[in-house]
Amino acid sequence: MAIKIKVAHVIRVFSYGGAEVLLREFFAQPEFKAQIISDVFVLDHKKLGLKDDVTPNINKFYYYKITTWRFLFEYIKFLRDIKKGNYDVVHMHLPVAGWMGVVAKLFTSKKTKYIYSEHNLVNFYSKYNYYLSGWTYGFFDSVIYVSHEVGEVIRKVQKGWFFKTHHPVTILNGIDTNKFHCTHRYELKPAETLTIGLVARFRPQKRVERWAEVAAEVHKKKPNIKFLMVGDGPSDDLLRQRIKELNIEGVIELPGMLTDTYTAYKRIDIFLLTSDFEGLPLALLEAMSCGCVPVISNVGGIKQLDFGGIGYKFDDFNPSEIADKIVAYTQNPDQYFIESDRSRDFVIKYYSLTKQVNEIIDLYRELMK
């Protein structure tokens, strides 16, 4: 039997963003638990929403107060904890965790390998994240791209040491298709109503104010259609202000962030995403696995999703045209059911979580040789 690998997973927040939720799913997978001893390091103590979810499946959970006046003390404590852990692998997820975490390489054994997962298109990062990431990439022993588009952008911005990568690999995001499976679709009556939904962290790139604009157009054309936006985040106030300006207060249900996203997907029939950029959105794959039909902006890693005949990808944001595509499903229910089935089949075929987990474990073992 192979020796278990001891891994420190480092991330800035541990709430309900795609990368965080994906980690939660990793830790619950039998293959991962059988081969990996996982410790979690969260740099911002204010956002620990998934802590209780992962505790049964990991070894230790650490968190720090880097957003307080104690920043320097907390950062030193973090570096000491990484050193004491004597890890085989330190796996960092998203910026901040990447450029703060890799400093620990100065204090740990050469046998410890440092891996960074890039979940987004770096050219859309804030200036400080962009430059700090670019200057520290060369210290990682391997960089994982979660989509082909993510890797293409990195290659375009590389210049000398800037975004220099060692052992880059593309490992596509995957989901647990057994967990995200809804069997109630054929009970729907699309001719009467559908529910348009979103499950996301309301970050600026999600452009949730545009989501509200589409909802307003759909509501004018088909008042019976319902709307559900599950999430919270920095753009929450912007969203609510736009809803008020559009005079659709009370039209969109806003329950905040839910721990059980599967329950949300069961209620959603059409998954609407109006982002400016994406790596490979986990929530989209989860929604499609549940049979939700995607209506999404054709940006970033979404471009690589070759699912002709399923939903609608838009290159230009035109709320009225997008609304027409959505309303058309109420006029042709049979087409909705066909595309719902195709959505799930597509994810099962190409984006299995088991495949992703095994590829990451293989990478760990390869680097340890």
Report the location of each language-model feature.
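A conserved mid-protein helix/loop that constitutes part of the nucleotide-sugar donor-binding site
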Residues: 17-25, 194, 198-220, 227, ...
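Short His-centered aromatic/hydrophobic patch
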Residues: 92-99, 118
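Acidic anion/phosphate-binding donor-loop and adjacent secondary structure
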Residues: 127, 155, 172-192
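Short hydrophobic beta-strand element within catalytic cores of glycosyltransferases
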Residues: 41, 293-296
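Aromatic "clamp/platform" in nucleotide-sugar-dependent glycosyltransferases that forms part
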Residues: 257, 276
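N-terminal strand-loop element at the rim of the active site
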Residues: 9-73, 162-164
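Conserved acidic donor-binding segment of nucleotide-sugar-dependent glycosyltransferases
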Residues: 308, 312-319, 328-333
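A short, active-site helix/loop in glycosyltransferases that binds the activated sugar's phosphate group
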Residues: 140-170, 175, 179
